[in-house]
Amino acid sequence: MLNESFSPSASTRGHRVRELVCAYRPLRDSDGRVVDVPTVMLTDPRTAAAVLAPLIADQSVEVFGVACVSTKHRLLAWHVLSRGTRASTPVSMPDVFVPACLTPGTTGVMVVHNHPSGDPTPSPDDARLTLRLCAAADVLDLPLLDHLIVGDEHRYFSFREAGLMGASPAGR
């Protein structure tokens, strides 16, 4: 849950802390292994889906991950955050943003999960999660660039393309 008394000055301090931590941490995945990610630019939802969907699309359960990107949307890191059931996966707000705070050069994030049914249509829970993520991104001053849901046969749903990223200035 977000601390609603989080002030802009605390946000600025958080940004500085993130910069300091990033200067001293190697790039690692959620299992602690050093990550080697391809040099690719995630400049639009279609490209992001083409690059990230193969990492989770064929799973028999829902998998939720976060892509950390640079100012020019270069993929810096990919972190699988949770694996759930055929119908859902748990998502913790801190777990979504911690990898971004610890990945050097991160200036934005994209969250991605699959629908094992193959139908990328978002559920009401997916929409609520996106709004919560937009609010958390605002507090952290870290843009949430998109929430992608991937299905089968290269199908995907982009909350950005659908205009459903909420009223988040950081997410625009």
Model-derived regions, located:
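Active-site-proximal loop/helix of nucleotide/amide-processing enzymes and allied scaffolds
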Residues: 1-30, 38, 47-50, 72, ...
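Glycine-enriched loop-and-adjacent helix/strand subsegments that border the catalytic/binding cleft
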Residues: 31-74
